[in-house]
Amino acid sequence: MLSGLVTALRTLTLFPVPGKETDTFSRSLFWFPVVGLLLGSIQAALGYFTSLLGWNELSAAFVVLGGIALTRGMHADGLADLADGFWGGRTRESALRIMKDPNVGSFGAIALSGMMLLKWIAILKLVDIGAFACIAAGVLLARWVQVLLASALPYARREGGTAQSFVSGAGVVHIVVTSALTLLFLFPLLHADLYANLYAVVAMISAALAAALLTGLLSYRKIGGVTGDVLGAGSEVTELFVWIAAALSAALKA
């Protein structure tokens, strides 16, 4: 079972995990919330300790850039590829072809820049009020959404691809188990946060589901399923939606 954790860490992070390569791709999905909690905790800690410098704008920037660094920029790259393909390709085939191009086009650059700016704004609000647990929760929920997308939609590329091994083995059991794990981690995590009341928790979970629905429907309509880029983009969109929901909830509470 731990081989699934190894695969999840190798896939989702830059951490050098020792051991042999395994083919436990579908089993690794069960560990996505665990890895999300780990990454989120690191980003939250990064935000907290840099905020002690008294320069919250810089702290928020460290959280955004830290998230990109911890994932080797993989999810950010997926967002850029998705934007280029979905808005630059008129047909399913052209969209998939553009998404496979390693070069970033104008749509991708705009999407990536906009995402980083909006994340920075939302995180700055959370840092200002000390809601660091909400930062971790956003990363946790984003990895859960990746499992939802992989389990609910077929793989889009007929010729196969990197993420096919994850998507082809995903199913209802992955949704059930990861949903339980996500809730198990989420409520204790946010219980310690002064600003994360029940309404905020509901708002954050709803924001994550909205991100999953938006990404899933758009991807199914455009390319008939998901790819690795779609899963990465879904993670990015979820983080943004959850952090905005948390920031708005805190503002309304205040």
UniProtKB/Swiss-Prot annotation:
Catalytic activity: alpha-ribazole + adenosylcob(III)inamide-GDP = adenosylcob(III)alamin + GMP + H(+); alpha-ribazole 5'-phosphate + adenosylcob(III)inamide-GDP = adenosylcob(III)alamin 5'-phosphate + GMP + H(+)
HAMAP family in the cross-refs: CobS
Listed InterPro entries: CobS
The protein, known as: Adenosylcobinamide-GDP ribazoletransferase
A GO CC term attached to the entry: plasma membrane
Pfam families, per database record: CobS
Pathways involved: Cofactor biosynthesis; adenosylcobalamin biosynthesis; adenosylcobalamin from cob(II)yrinate a,c-diamide: step 7/7
UniProt KW Cell inner membrane keyword: yes
